[in-house]
Amino acid sequence: MSIAERITALRALMADRGYDVYMVPTDDNHQSEYVGEHFKARAFITGFTGSAGTAVITKDEAGLWTDGRYFVQAAQQLEGSGVKLFKMGEPGVPTVEEYIANVIPENGTLGFDGRVVAMGEGQALVEAVAPKHAKINYSEDLIDLIWEDRPALSEKPAFALGEEYTGESTASKLARIREAMKEHGATVHVIAALDDVCWTTNLRGDDIEYFPLLLSYAVITMDDMKLYIDERKLTD
């Protein structure tokens, strides 16, 4: 499908499910700066392949917000697509939140995949649409429903790095983390950032091109640590 056809398909889904505005950010479930192929939903719906940007689709308009690093690239890749470029930080250019607040109708509905939106950003969106008494539905990934050949989540194996490369054992790192937890009165520490999980566990992966990161989460208590990971990645 062309970009125009993808946007048309998304709008049909939006109408069927009652969305007035649908937002597609760049992020993955871990708020990574660079994401694996499965998470490149914004690139799929706009054709813009830069590492930063947010797409917003309405019944009549499609827009892409990105920063100054990508103005030239975005203008080239969006040409003829029907997607309007919003140059972030430029005079007179609304933020994503300002734009949504303006275009969403009274009692309308804003949608996005809540798994890839940080809490702070989500709260900003709640506040943006509140004056219009609009609702937010973050339970559906509409892009997944139209992306027929979407790459699967990476199943590439994890691998461990020895202390000669990491400089410190996982046990030592956990001991230091637990000391910090005590200082802050915490009994449970949840790690969602991929680089933090990899540093703590001394594990690496190949789930994001050019970055040795591993799709995973970790939960540390005073007694143990649990690693949440696709078990197909583990060989031992």
Each PLM stretch: what is its role?
Residues 1-236:
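Terminal domain-start leader segments
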